[in-house]
Amino acid sequence: MKDSGDSKDQQLMVALRVRPISVAELEEGATLIAHKVDEQMVVLMDPMEDPDDILRAHRSREKSYLFDVAFDFTATQEMVYQATTKSLIEGVISGYNATVFAYGPTGCGKTYTMLGTDQEPGIYVQTLNDLFRAIEETSNDMEYEVSMSYLEIYNEMIRDLLNPSLGYLELREDSKGVIQVAGITEVSTINAKEIMQLLMKGNRQRTQEPTAANQTSSRSHAVLQVTVRQRSRVKNILQEVRQGRLFMIDLAGSERASQTQNRGQRMKEGAHINRSLLALGNCINALSDKGSNKYINYRDSKLTRLLKDSLGGNSRTVMIAHISPASSAFEESRNTLTYAGRAKNIKTRVKQNLLNVSYHIAQYTSIIADLRGEIQRLKRKIDEQTGRGQARGRQDRGDIRHIQAEVQLHSGQGEKAGMGQLREQLASAFQEQMDVRRRLLELENRAMEVQIDTSRHLLTIAGWKHEKSRRALKWREEQRKECYAKDDSEKDSDTGDDQPDILEPPEVAAARESIAALVDEQKQLRKQKLALEQRCRELRARGRRLEETLPRRIGSEEQREVLSLLCRVHELEVENTEMQSHALLRDGALRHRHEAVRRLEQHRSLCDEIIQGQRQIIDDYNLAVPQRLEELYEVYLRELEEGSLEQATIMDQVASRALQDSSLPKITPAGTSLTPDSDLESVKTLSSDAQHLQNSALPPLSTESEGHHVFKAGTGAWQAKSSSVPTPPPIQLGSLVTQEAPAQDSLGSWINSSPDSSENLSEIPLSHKERKEILTGTKCIWVKAARRRSRALGTEGRHLLAPATERSSLSLHSLSEGDDARPPGPLACKRPPSPTLQHAASEDNLSSSTGEAPSRAVGHHGDGPRPWLRGQKKSLGKKREESLEAKRRKRRSRSFEVTGQGLSHPKTHLLGPHQAERISDHRMPVCRHPAPGIRHLGKVTLPLAKVKLPPSQNTGPGDSSPLAVPPNPGGGSRRATRGPRLPHGTSTHGKDGCSRHN
């Protein structure tokens, strides 16, 4: 048994804890003089005035101290433990020594830090809890022995706190120089609860007395020693034992008799406490002095002798200094900080305590050799049986009957159960054989111990017999000298008769009794050994029989391959399922993306239609357009010429078709819902077309979501938007229903929304059945129009607004002719839209399509006449009215339904020079009443739709309504206001003197 381990230098760790100021100190008028600056620095200020302050500068005489870690009154017990002691536990388990001690004057919280309370346990309890937790975590690989001793040094006398009846104990030094306490009680335990109970028992035995400075003053130094021995569970001929010791010391505080007001016994206790602390301070001073190699006097106090290894030997040491922040304890705090600062310079030489223990080498060597031979024999047998099995398999490969018999043999459930039972028997035989070998080993160890004890007792008896014969010889010599003159016969008789009987000592009698018991035990051990050897031979024979039986009943390599292939098939099935799930997720994501692209394409088509219609109105009326809007329109034209978005759409359609043709599971697209319309008959008529076009039509665009708009409404349009009117009911003007089903249910409105829609048309061909159904739906529309024609014949023409421009009549005529030549309904998708239908939009057909007066007045900056109203003649207006009236009478017999884009949730927006991006996207606003006070910023914003006007209603002075330009009374107001609705035929006069009909 010897110590081993490499040593290394370790710096002594010093921590400082400043306790909170007490109520008694505040009542005495004390002030705070100790402050924590950061995690390591503490400043102590001198409360007294400087007697050498000649210049009366009153400079602060403060001094800063730097430690490894500093705590103020806000620190908790857990924080102190984590920063100081927790790191020592791993080293103690590994075989290193460690020491933690609290230092400082009386009443500064040393006992509170070390012991704590039930609610806030101190370092003792937390360290022991973590120590046993760490032992439990590694107990599977290591064996541990934990022992504990608890003592106190009271008046320079050592007392055992676990067993106070032992009295005062003495310090001794063993052969290695380690200080030991003779007769101390060491309690071995591996249970945390038990060691906590012992700790509480020792604390109750500790000496505590009240003083004027501290009501619970500790009158002794308490030392708790925990020893941990660690050894590996794997047995070997050489075993390594690691022994670590942990010292936790609660020192008594230094005190002044003037402060504590001690008398008698308390004063003697204080003197002894101060003496031991003075010796500790001298040791700290000597150890911290780097320049001198002087002698360190540890013998001045028993405390310093116990702390010899902790201060300058083999230990990792942590010193927790405690001070009071009150000005009344300035001197004690300064001395404590001084000694703590010096202790930082102390270095200890730490090494691991390793004990190498040699056991019975010859015995363990023979056992290991037997086990290795057994392993080699089993390996050879397995190899031989494997070779015979392969050779037999090659010989019988062509024998079909043998193969069938073998398959039937291994396919039955009974054979499988027999194989499992055979394997279990073999495993149990090996386990029993190992147990018997282990018991034989234990018997051998016990027999050797009995033999050693027998030899020791025999030596004791032999020594006594030798002593007895020596005494008898000496007595005979003495008798021979005394009776030299007597007769020889008398001498012989005297010596034989008078020789005293020598009493046998008790240890010899005990040895004789022990020898008898040991002889009996040896006989029992011999019998048990013979029985175990016989059992071992039987188990070996049983194992050999099982080893010979198992190869004949075990399956071939093919069965093992089948089992592995089945496992592989299962793994591949799992992987295949995962791949299918990933494919489904990817398919769903692609289809959602395709739906989003289709929705954006519909939105783009609607925006193209709106942009082109508004541009046609601007060109027809020569309206002034801001430069910003012109630039944006040029960008738009370039994008149309490039056709990048159409190409992207075509690629998306090709990708979607390729995805549909794949073998992955299909995702059914959501059916498009038909937007409710006020015209119930129109909805019923178009429902058949919508059912056939459901797979190709897109879902309706939400007019409320701003996220999909190309142009988002700005803040300036919200007021007009809030005053807008929802989707109007059908209004009849001259027996005309001016509302139809929404355009999103029509395939033609989706494809023909842009000039380049022929490419999209070619991508979605219509079958003969679909064309026939569309034609049937169109005939239904014409039947409905014929029914309404009879009602229109009996209704007189309404007084509509008077025309104001030449373009109104021209556009009316062109629209009427274009509508006559073009069949309505979804058949319009067969050819590109007519430029006349797309761009020839005037105020009269717009008003007739919605049944309302124009909702917007066109204005520009300034109060002069508008560009498209210049040169207007009243005579031309009268002639135009007469010609229109004649046409209306001539073509009254012809009547058809006016269809228009469904206007759900209309919006009102204003356009300024820098507000082109705020235009509403796909629903143009239509208001019921004119807004006379609107001042526009250079662009006409009108509702756009494919308008069909009946020629029978286009004659007369009230058929068309001009774009009214109301006056701007304020001259500078840009805010849209709603005025009272004026009756038909009234006129307003602007500042330019021109008459405008409302």
UniProtKB/Swiss-Prot annotation:
Coiled-coil residue windows: 360-391, 424-452, 507-552
Annotated Basic and acidic residues bias: 482-494, 989-998
Compartments, record wording: Cytoplasm, Cytoskeleton; Cell projection, Cilium
GO cellular component: axoneme; cilium; cytoplasm; kinesin complex; microtubule
A GO term for molecular function: ATP hydrolysis activity
Residues the record lists as binding ATP: G104, P105, T106, G107, C108, G109, K110, T111
Domain Kinesin motor as annotated: residue spans: 11-346
SUPFAM superfamilies, alphabetized: P-loop containing nucleoside triphosphate hydrolases
Pfam families: Kinesin
Ranges of compositional bias, category Polar residues: 662-676, 684-697, 746-761, 836-852
UniProt-listed GO biological process terms: axonemal microtubule depolymerization; microtubule-based movement; plus-end specific microtubule depolymerization
Segments for region (Disordered): 482-503, 662-706, 746-765, 794-911, 948-998
Keywords, comma-separated and alphabetical: ATP-binding, Cell projection, Cilium, Coiled coil, Cytoplasm, Cytoskeleton, Microtubule, Motor protein, Nucleotide-binding
Cited function: Plus end-directed microtubule-dependent motor protein that regulates the length of motile cilia by mediating depolymerization of microtubules at ciliary tips.
Similarity annotation: Belongs to the TRAFAC class myosin-kinesin ATPase superfamily. Kinesin family.
PANTHER family xref list: CENTROMERE PROTEIN E (PTHR47968), KINESIN-LIKE PROTEIN (PTHR47968:SF69)
Protein name as catalogued: Kinesin-like protein KIF19
